[in-house]
Amino acid sequence: MTDTIAATKDELLNQAAREYRAFHEALQGLNEEHMTEVWLGTWSIKDIVAHISGWHREMGPALERLARGEKPIPAGVSYDDVDAWNARFAAERREEPVADVLLEFDKSHEYFMHAAAAVPVDRLQPGKTAWKLVDNNSAHHYREHSEQIRAWRRSRSV
């Protein structure tokens, strides 16, 4: 989509919405076989979608805590091993039908964006924790993976 850097809360949320739509466009026309074919390391597109949903569900509460003026991450929780979290999120949905994983993606996006919208403007500024949480788990994440999916589709003429 675009690499335009958002400067306000509204721009950030709008950018997330645009990249979400672009991510869905990258999936358009793919069938069950395409969605479950492993091609990104050990992952399929279904796994990509599942792990994004996992981050939504994991980081939504962090945004809710920030909106209440609390620390975003509970004591004792670490996200240093992102790959382990990614693997966990993908594995949690591996046995679910593609349609259910896609539905959960839509629901988790809606939940995450609702949590992001509730963060006060003064806490949702470029460079602040809330800003990074929103961008990294929405626009940036959608763009990263939609680009990978589009490249895979081009390589396969899909």
Description of each model-found segment:
Residues 81-122:
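Acidic/histidine-rich alpha-helical segments that form the ligand environment
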Residues 5-32, 54, 58-65:
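Alpha-helical bundle segments that constitute or directly flank the non-heme di-iron/ferroxidase center
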Residues 7, 11, 43, 47, ...:
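Positions in alpha-helical segments
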Residues 9, 13-16, 20, 98-105, ...:
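Hydrophobic packing residues in well-ordered alpha-helices of helical domains and bundles
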Residues 19-26, 55, 108-111, 115, ...:
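Amphipathic, well-ordered alpha-helical segments in soluble domains
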Residues 1-7, 157-158:
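Basic/polar N-terminal segments that are highly enriched at the extreme N-terminus
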Residues 34-84, 118-158:
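Short, contiguous alpha-helical
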